[in-house]
């Protein structure tokens, strides 16, 4: 490993460690739950009855969201440059592991400008995170990537799908604690 790679790895680890502190300084507010009066964003999420995603995972496997029908799915758009996004990853992994054996999946879609950023992050994570905490990782710029969820002006942006594949909640910014209760109820 060259000195440059060691420096890059040290910087990435430092960024991961400092992410919670940075995220608390500028955490955007989540959208209200769907049982609240419908905002424009909530109405937009509800208008996407059955999202469709077709892609290759970052390890080259074909992926289609339709394969997860019958499961509760949390689809999160994120970026390695987003402190709030990186801050949420350990929470996502912990809950994913906690619901192992239940019909629950997480799909993380990196919106990084270049795939190498997502690959570098995954390489670091693969050294520290057990396999049972790993979920589907996709890069939105990969050849053949398609989704009908549109562009995301703010990250993270997450969609909660019920077992019928319909959007029941949309979150922008931090995923609130109530989201985990909602997921538990859907399971």
Task: State where each predicted segment sits.
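Thiol-based oxidoreductase modules, predominantly thioredoxin-like and allied folds used
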Residues: 103-117, 131-142
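Conserved redox-active cysteine motifs that mediate thiol-disulfide chemistry
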Residues: 77-94
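Short, internal strand/loop/helix patches
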Residues: 122-159
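Short pre-active-site segment immediately N-terminal to redox-active cysteine/selenocysteine motifs
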Residues: 71-73, 78-81, 154
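Bacterial N-terminal signal peptides
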Residues: 8-19
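Boundary at the C-terminal end of the N-terminal hydrophobic targeting segment
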Residues: 21-23
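N-terminal "domain-start" segment that seeds a small globular fold
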Residues: 26-65, 133
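Thiol-/selenol-based redox modules, centered on thioredoxin-like
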Residues: 29-31, 154-187
């Amino acid at each position: 490993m060259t000195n440059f790679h060691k420096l890059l790895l040290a910087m990435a680890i430092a960024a991961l460690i400092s992410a919670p502190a940075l995220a608390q300084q500028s955490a955007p507010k989540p959208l209200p739950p769907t049982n609240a009066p419908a905002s424009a964003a909530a109405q937009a999420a509800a208008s996407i009855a059955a999202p469709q995603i077709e892609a290759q995972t970052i390890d080259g496997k074909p992926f289609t969201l339709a394969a997860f029908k019958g499961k509760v799915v949390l689809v999160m758009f994120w970026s390695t440059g987003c402190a709030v996004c990186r801050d949420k990853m350990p929470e996502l992994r912990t809950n994913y592991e906690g619901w192992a054996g239940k019909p629950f999946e997480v799909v993380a879609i990196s919106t990084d400008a270049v795939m190498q950023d997502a690959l570098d992050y995954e390489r670091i994570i693969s050294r520290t995170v057990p396999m049972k905490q790993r979920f589907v990782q996709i890069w939105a710029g990969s050849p053949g990537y398609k989704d009908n969820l549109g562009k995301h002006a703010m990250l993270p942006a997450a969609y909660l799908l019920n077992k019928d594949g319909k959007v029941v909640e949309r979150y922008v910014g931090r995923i609130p604690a109530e989201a985990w209760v909602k997921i538990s109820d859907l399971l």
